[in-house]
């Protein structure tokens, strides 16, 4: 079993997300979104949690500061990129956030790649509401990080079965590999917990699992780990669950 560092990343990458908030109405504010995007990128790259204070409403500021501070403990050397993205089908403005860098955990150094997409609503240049639309991350340790592909769908239907795969692009042959998968709860994400992930022997080609979507619309957040002779690969992804009706 191993502690899963990636869950801290998931919850911190979702620092602009509060499950109690969702964007209600589209707003025409293209230039305002571009300005906010630039300011957010500057604030995230400043390394100061207080830099977000001018970007968010008073209600959101404490949550943002706490989550960013925790994130910086585990991932102190990262670079953020924030860009406006295409509006949602109902006209809501969106942002794409990407982060790259390195992290250390349990004596291993990880290369980090992660991204998320959020729908937002601004009021006088401040973030007041948001909705997480997509999220995924990849952490790889070792002098030569293992080339892998995260094959998990973005959207699935309620009640359907679907595959959660972490594919090794250059199979390891007879090498001993162990892997595991867990469904992260909202409570684990909000608390920025590091759950213990049980591992089992896997083939050299990666980890391949079939999972069940819930019967109600919403989302599922998956955490996957693969331990190989040269290091560790961890990945996360949020899957939207939509009604089949």
Features from the language model and the residues they span:
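Bacterial N-terminal signal peptides
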Residues: 8-17
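Short solvent-exposed beta->alpha transition segments
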Residues: 28, 34, 49-103, 107-109
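Short acidic/polar inter-strand loop motif in beta-rich domains
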Residues: 104, 226-236
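Short beta-strand edge/turn micro-motifs at domain boundaries
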Residues: 110-147
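Contiguous segments within soluble domain cores/interaction surfaces
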Residues: 149, 154-208, 235
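Short, aromatic- and glycine-rich surface loops/edge beta-strands on solvent-exposed regions
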Residues: 210-230
